[in-house]
Amino acid sequence: MKRCIKFTIFLLLMASMIFTFASCTKVEVADGEIVAIFQYGDVDITKSMTHEDSETVRKMFNKKNLYSDSPSCGFSENVALIAGGDTYCIACDDCGTLYSVNEDKYFNLSDKENETLRKLLGKYGFTFPCV
């Protein structure tokens, strides 16, 4: 009897682990144009990113794990990147967390990636913090 119970518990644990790992959603930025939007204060910028910059962003975002949370970082669709109809809101402070509007989930960049992204967006007129 004990053996049967242990085996059942083992199967349940394995099933829950498989479900957990199989349900992990990852960022997949669509190929093509990425539009940078920065509408803050008196600034109203909507610009297509260069192919090179779009590829940098795509490589940075793709395969990042999406998760549900309520981070304290401030997000707005007025400070965002749009790719293939997907909107990625950039934290208005210096936080390395981004919000995927379409997935209603968040993902993180490393400190180096966050710094690279903010420098890249500076070329398009973005300024941080913008809270």
Task: Show the residue positions of the predicted features.
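Bacterial N-terminal signal peptides that target proteins for export
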Residues: 1-10
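Residue-level signal for mature regions of secreted extracellular proteins and peptides
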Residues: 14-17
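Function-determining sites in protein domains
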Residues: 24-131
